[in-house]
């Protein structure tokens, strides 16, 4: 005998299904379920008197016989490839399958087997996303990693050695000794980590030795001298060893203008940091490079989105981060040349058009490591409010396309940029199970659970002395996946293929599995998921106005944003 449930009751019991819409936090963004992999009437749910019991939704099948280690039930997945309802099976720390979980002996279409060896996380009522990737990290202090993972970031890429003056300004881990030290330190954290060597050299030998030592890429920074000669040498070495190059260009235009830097690229692929320019780069027109097919452009989060406070805070940040002196007129002029409301406003729109492909933090060096995800969705909200629905959404009720475009900016696209998309960056079978669960009201602000390599690493947790898990104070705390050997067994360290072939991880006794980056040199802007636009960009050198394909790009600064004070009263 069948049983009918109305939509509200069904959603409250098993989560939303096809056609249902969910609001993202307190934004004006709504997503709508496109497909449901579960089976009506055969859904699995854990609890007293519910489905996942022996002989019912739980089979007697052993782990060796095919049962998975963990199932997230009735998950609403938001990823660049879709908005779907499904069960997620996890085995050996990797995503095993997205589909229908249960007991194949009594249920139809089961492709994820629940058995005696299977743990359950209730995904109903939650949005599930891939763990975020922050591809612009100054490794100034290890406490950044705690803040990052608590916000939903599970992979950090950048450079540094701690609060050294060089690291405070540049994302470089220079030389073999420093690279090995940082690789060894990485074992202590439930975080995928990769380090960029210093790329500033007109001769290749010093760059090659860093790649051989284990750098996953190279970083060119103007504070070390990003000249055309250094750019050319760095990209030549990267091409030879299949690693990515990130660049912070010459703000002062000392060694050349943006056209000279573009010429030095010679059509070779490169990741441009803070491509708008407030974080650094040819003043006032570095933003032009986002039109190039070989440039993979990202933003850093202090300019995301453009608000009434953006300009004022940037001047002070810049003086500190780049070791400038407010009493030296030239230093003040340097700072002021980088902060332009016109290009920051244009950056908002270029993100909405899909011309900027990624967002990262620039942690403690003009960026906030715990706000990559928040700032991304605030930008999406601001653009929805100011620009309306996107052209591709005109036939849709919800904001699915915009949501997919923006989530790609801190998940799959930085993974592709840096050659790690085989391992992380999306909810897909075979990838590391780095997964965030969000209550819709808290989406993008405070994750409920952060799963790292199949283990719960951080989670919202109440008083440990309470009789149940929920009494106040409830806040993000490290869980068992963040301790002991679990930190290394559930994470990855990214290195060059050259270092892996030379068995550097074994030589320096790394506990975290090391994997090589790949496919970094034969990609282009066209490979950036939903963020591949290459409009012709023009910048007026006197007014700083930005035009894309002849259209003036301008918008008002936001006076109020969602995902702010109401979420952070405590």
Swiss-Prot record:
Cofactors, names only: Ni cation
Give the catalytic activity. urea + 2 H2O + H(+) = hydrogencarbonate + 2 NH4(+)
A molecular-function term among this protein's GO annotations:
nickel cation binding
Compartments where located = Cytoplasm
Q: What class of enzyme is it?
A: hydrolase
Has UniProt tagged this entry with the keyword Cytoplasm?
yes
**Biological process annotations from GO:** urea catabolic process
Residues the entry annotates as binding Ni(2+) 1:
136, 138, 219, 362
Q: How is the cofactor bound?
A: Binds 2 nickel ions per subunit.
Q: What is its main location?
A: cytoplasm
Q: Which UniProt keywords apply?
A: Cytoplasm, Hydrolase, Metal-binding, Nickel
The entry's cellular-component GO terms read:
cytoplasm
Q: Which residues carry this modification: N6-carboxylysine?
A: 219
Q: Which residues form the active site?
A: 322
For whether the record's keyword set contains Metal-binding, the answer is yes
Pathway entry = Nitrogen metabolism; urea degradation; CO(2) and NH(3) from urea (urease route): step 1/1
Please name the InterPro entries in this protein's record: Amidohydro-rel, Metal-dep_hydrolase_composite, Metal_Hydrolase, Urease_alpha_N_dom, Urease_alpha_subunit, Urease_AS, Urease_asu, Urease_asu_c
- EC number(s) for this protein? 3.5.1.5
Q: Quaternary arrangement and interactors, per the entry?
A: Heterotrimer of UreA (gamma), UreB (beta) and UreC (alpha) subunits. Three heterotrimers associate to form the active enzyme.
What's the family?
Belongs to the metallo-dependent hydrolases superfamily. Urease alpha subunit family.
Name recorded for this polypeptide: Urease subunit alpha
Tell me the organism: Trichodesmium erythraeum (strain IMS101)
């Amino acid at each position: 005998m069948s049983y009918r449930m109305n939509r509200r009751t069904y959603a409250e019991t098993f989560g939303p299904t096809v056609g249902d819409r969910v609001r993202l936090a307190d934004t004006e963004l709504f997503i709508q379920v496109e497909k449901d992999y579960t089976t009506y009437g055969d859904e699995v749910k854990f609890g007293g008197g519910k489905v996942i019991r022996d002989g019912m939704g739980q089979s007697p099948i052993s782990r060796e016989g095919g049962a998975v280690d963990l199932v997230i039930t009735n998950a609403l997945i938001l990823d660049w490839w879709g908005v779907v309802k499904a069960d997620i099976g996890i085995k050996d720390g990797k995503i095993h399958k997205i589909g229908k979980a249960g007991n194949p002996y009594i249920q139809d279409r089961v492709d994820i087997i629940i058995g005696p060896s299977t743990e359950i996380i209730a995904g109903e009522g939650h949005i599930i996303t891939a763990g975020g990737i922050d591809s612009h990290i100054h490794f100034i202090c290890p406490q950044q990693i705690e803040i990052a993972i608590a916000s939903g970031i599970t992979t950090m890429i950048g450079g540094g050695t701690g609060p050294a003056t060089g690291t405070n300004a540049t994302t470089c881990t220079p030389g073999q000794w420093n690279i090995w030290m940082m690789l060894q330190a990485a074992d202590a954290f439930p975080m995928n980590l990769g380090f960029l060597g210093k790329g500033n050299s007109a001769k290749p030998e010093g760059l090659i030795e860093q790649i051989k030592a284990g750098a996953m890429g190279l970083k060119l920074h103007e504070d070390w001298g990003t000249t055309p000669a250094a750019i050319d040498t760095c990209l030549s070495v990267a091409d030879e060893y299949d690693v990515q190059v990130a660049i912070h260009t010459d703000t002062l235009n000392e060694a050349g203008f943006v056209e000279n830097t573009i010429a030095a690229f010679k059509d070779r692929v490169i990741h441009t940091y803070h491509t708008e320019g407030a974080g650094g780069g040819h003043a006032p027109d570095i933003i032009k490079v986002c039109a190039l097919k070989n440039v993979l452009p990202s933003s850093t989060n202090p300019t995301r989105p453009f608000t009434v406070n953006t300009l004022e805070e940037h001047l002070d940040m810049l003086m500190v981060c780049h070791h400038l002196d407010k009493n030296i007129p030239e230093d003040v002029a340097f700072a002021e040349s980088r902060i332009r409301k016109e290009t920051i406003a244009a950056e908002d729109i270029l993100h909405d058009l899909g011309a900027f492909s990624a967002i990262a933090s620039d942690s403690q060096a003009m960026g906030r490591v715990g706000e990559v995800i928040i700032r991304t969705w605030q930008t999406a909200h601001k653009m929805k409010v100011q620009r309306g629905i996107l052209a591709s959404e005109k036939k849709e009720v919800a904001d699915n396309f915009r949501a997919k475009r923006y989530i790609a900016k801190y998940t799959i696209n930085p993974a592709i940029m840096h050659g790690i998309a085989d391992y992380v960056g999306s909810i897909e079978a075979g990838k590391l199970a780095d997964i965030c669960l969000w209550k819709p009201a808290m989406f993008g602000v405070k994750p409920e659970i952060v799963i790292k390599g199949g283990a719960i690493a951080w989670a919202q947790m109440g008083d440990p002395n309470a009789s149940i898990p929920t009494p106040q104070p409830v806040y993000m705390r490290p869980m068992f996946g963040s301790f002991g050997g679990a930190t290394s067994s559930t994470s990855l360290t990214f290195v060059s293929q050259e270092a892996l072939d030379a068995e550097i991880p074994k030589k320096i006794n790394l506990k975290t599995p090391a994997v090589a980056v790949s496919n970094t040199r034969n990609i282009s802007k066209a490979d950036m998921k939903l963020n591949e636009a290459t409009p012709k960009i023009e910048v007026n050198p006197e007014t700083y106005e930005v035009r894309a394909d002849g259209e003036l790009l301008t918008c008002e600064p936001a006076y109020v944003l969602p995902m702010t004070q109401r979420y952070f009263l405590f």
